[in-house]
UniProtKB/Swiss-Prot annotation:
The protein, known as: Kelch repeat and BTB domain-containing protein 2
UniProt note: domains: Recognizes the BCR (BTB-CUL3-RBX1) E3 ubiquitin ligase complex substrate, PIK3R1, through the 4 tandem C-terminal Kelch domains.
One Pfam family it belongs to: BTB
Pathway(s) it belongs to: Protein modification; protein ubiquitination
Quaternary context: Component of the BCR(KBTBD2) E3 ubiquitin ligase complex, at least composed of CUL3, KBTBD2 and RBX1. Interacts (via the BTB domain) with CUL3.
Organism whose genome encodes this protein: Mus musculus
Function: Substrate-specific adapter of a BCR (BTB-CUL3-RBX1) E3 ubiquitin ligase complex that acts as a regulator of the insulin signaling pathway, modulating insulin sensitivity by limiting PIK3R1/p85alpha abundance in adipocytes. Targets PIK3R1, the regulatory subunit of phosphatidylinositol 3-kinase (PI3K), for 'Lys-48'-linked polyubiquitination and proteasome-mediated degradation.
InterPro entries: BACK, BTB-kelch_protein, BTB/POZ_dom, BTB_POZ_KBTBD2, KBTBD2_BACK, Kelch-typ_b-propeller, Kelch_1, SKP1/BTB/POZ_sf
BACK domain segment(s): 133-229
UniProt keyword Acetylation, yes or no: no
Length: 623
């Protein structure tokens, strides 16, 4: 028999002990200290307080008078916040909300309760938005919370054009203002915005802030200002201020030629869930700049998340929602020639893309799990519409709305019908949802749905885009009336793609010119608005052949499609079948340019050392 001592940890005993301490606290048994705040008494146990708070631990172990007292008065402490901290000490439970978190953080900071501080930090970082980021920046600076401060600062930089007129911005300290105005990461397209922000802050309290005139104006990069702005600005200055302004601008001279981050952003086509060349991952995300004809790597959604909904807001915020993730401990075969052996779980995840950090940031999940929901932004809210789900027909009808300021979802009126697939667009603050030959319009202010005119053709997996007061429904698969067989829209051989246009003012559909694609083009195109033009991104080769992509542009007056750009095979390789495509403005300097390399399936088994690419013969690299 082994003499080795056997040790087991009884976790149930630990839980029981905590419950017993809580019972003693509630019944005021064996208490040995009374905390007094604003006339309210809190009988407690020194041992419990010292366990969670460095402040109380130092107080009770110092040997000073407080360590021997039975009653301790705490000043500058909020009674409600103290009650929450005491409850946490006895239970480990902490209910944080918008109305209590800042006072709770302040009290926990004074009492040095690190667990509560961490919970509050995580909550505040998650809640940062354009409405509160400036205030939270000042709050974090006051309490020396560097993690919260950096997160708030990034949001101020990202939303600068929306926040620099806020009252909280006017009340920023001089040091924080300089930190912001000097940042290379300001998301501004013109330096005039920075100049205006600086002048507004100085003029908010001219008497007390005149001493900062030189230091504030030295953050303006005068070379980036237009000549008209420079001349008008100097002419409008009081004579006594001109020398100070010149001195301040002279200090900014070394930064003259460095543009702000927002001045470098490019409108790009963003591809989510593209086929991945990485054997350890199913999917990848890339973006393509039509101006530079370059492809950049985008941070892929966490945990191989796929079958998501995507949306880009008018403020250029990118969100994804729903989808599926692979289950853990399941065998996965990522080979393109083998059948996938992965089990998936449907999720209600919701992420915001931090373009400066090139990372996905989790937000409050949706109320329902959804696969490929339609996402749109209407009147400042994000709507998640339908999508396939595990809840059957009822769940497919559900619609929920996300409040970006409150970071919360609420349900709205459901769809009149249940669909596994739909496309949605926004025109004149109304949401239009389409599938097959049906279309419904949602009016947010009355929370109601109305059936609109039916289309002339019944198509699934089409792409929809709003352009002016018109809705374009393009491509997809035509549903044969009798057999239900899905055929390419337009011609059977894929040499043209069907287009229908809806006029929201007349409530009527009409056929438009087909897209003159090549034979065997993929009918499931992606319609986007880029550079203020309606375009279609499509694959002009059969799915079994090498991928060749093009974009077509539509001329509304002439009702004609023309080839806009042929995308070189050197730039963009096979994206697969199910990728999402949207358009947003991104910063090339924050992305990694994707290097060109010949795909493995181009290597010929007969030993050929070159192949044709874009009409040229390209030699394979040496092995």
């Amino acid at each position: 028999m082994s003499t080795q001592e056997e040790r087991q940890i009884n976790t149930e005993y630990a839980v029981s002990l905590l419950e017993q301490l809580k019972l003693f606290y509630e019944q005021q048994l064996f208490t040995d200290i009374v905390l007094i705040v604003e006339g309210t008494e809190f009988p407690c146990h020194k041992m419990v307080l010292a366990t969670c708070s460095s402040y109380f631990r130092a107080m009770f172990m110092s040997g000073l008078s407080e360590s021997k007292q039975t009653h301790v008065h705490l000043r500058n402490v909020d009674a409600a916040a103290l009650q929450m901290i005491i409850a946490y000490a006895y239970t480990g439970n902490l209910a944080v909300n918008d109305s209590t978190v800042e006072q709770l953080y302040e009290t926990a900071c004074f009492l040095q309760v690190e667990d509560v501080l961490q919970r509050c930090r995580e909550y505040l970082i998650k809640k940062i938005n354009a409405e509160n980021c400036v205030r939270l920046l000042s709050f974090a600076d006051l309490f020396s919370c560097e993690e919260l401060k950096q997160s708030a600062k990034r949001m101020v930089e990202h939303k600068f054009t929306a926040v620099y007129r806020q009252e909280a911005f006017m009340q920023l300290s001089h040091d924080l203002l300089i930190d912001i105005l000097s940042s290379d990461n300001l998301n501004v397209e013109k330096e005039e915005t920075v100049r205006e922000a600086a002048m507004l802050w100085l003029e908010y309290n001219t008497e007390s802030r005149s001493q900062y005139l030189s230091s504030v104006l030295s953050q303006i990069r005068i070379d980036a200002l237009s000549e008209v702005t420079q001349r008008a600005w100097f002419q409008g200055l009081p004579p006594n201020d001109k020398s100070v302004v010149v001195q301040g601008l002279y200090k900014s001279m070394p930064k003259f030629f460095k543009p702000r981050l927002g001045m470098t952003k490019e409108e790009m086509m963003i591809f989510i869930e593209a086929s991945s060349e990485n054997p350890c991952s199913l999917y990848s995300s890339v973006c393509y700049s039509p101006q530079a004809e370059k492809v950049y790597k985008l941070c892929s959604p966490p945990a191989d998340l796929h079958k998501v909904g995507t949306v880009v807001t008018p403020d250029n915020d990118i969100y994804i929602a729903g989808g599926q993730v692979p289950l853990k401990n399941t065998k996965t075969n990522h080979s393109k020639t083998s059948k996938l052996q992965t089990a998936f779980r449907t999720v209600n995840c919701f992420y915001w893309f931090d373009a400066q950090q090139n990372t996905w940031f989790p937000k409050t999940p949706m109320l329902f799990v959804r696969v490929k929901p339609s996402l749109v932004c209407c009147e400042g809210y994000i709507y998640a519409i339908g999508g396939d789900s595990v809840g059957g027909e009822l769940n497919r009808r559900t619609v929920e709305r996300y409040d970006t300021e409150k970071d919360e979802w609420t349900m709205v009126s459901p769809l009149p019908c249940a669909w596994q697939w739909s496309a949605a667009v926004v025109v004149h603050d109304c949401i239009y949802v389409m599938t097959l030959n049906l279309m419904y319009c949602y009016f947010p202010r009355s929370d109601s749905w109305v059936e609109m005119a039916m289309r002339q053709t019944s198509r699934s997996f089409a792409s929809a885009a709003a352009f002016g007061d018109k809705i374009f429904y393009i491509g997809g698969l035509h549903i044969a009336t009798n057999s239900g067989i899905r055929l390419p829209s337009g011609t059977v051989d894929g040499s043209s793609v069907t287009v229908e246009i809806y006029d929201v003012n007349k409530n009527e559909w009409k056929m438009a010119a087909n897209i003159p694609a090549k034979r065997y083009s993929d009918p499931c195109v992606r319609a986007v608005v880029i550079s203020n033009s309606l375009c279609v991104f499509m694959r002009e080769t059969h799915l079994n052949e090498r991928a060749k992509y093009v974009t077509y542009q539509y001329d509304l007056e002439l009702d004609r499609w023309s080839l806009r750009q042929h995308i070189s095979e050197r730039v963009l390789w096979d994206l697969g079948r199910d990728f999402r495509c949207t358009v947003g403005k991104l910063y090339p300097s924050c992305l990694e340019e994707s290097p060109w390399k010949p795909p493995t399936y181009l290597f010929s088994p007969d030993g050929t050392e070159e192949f044709e690419l874009d009409g040229e013969m390209v030699a394979l690299p040496p092995v």
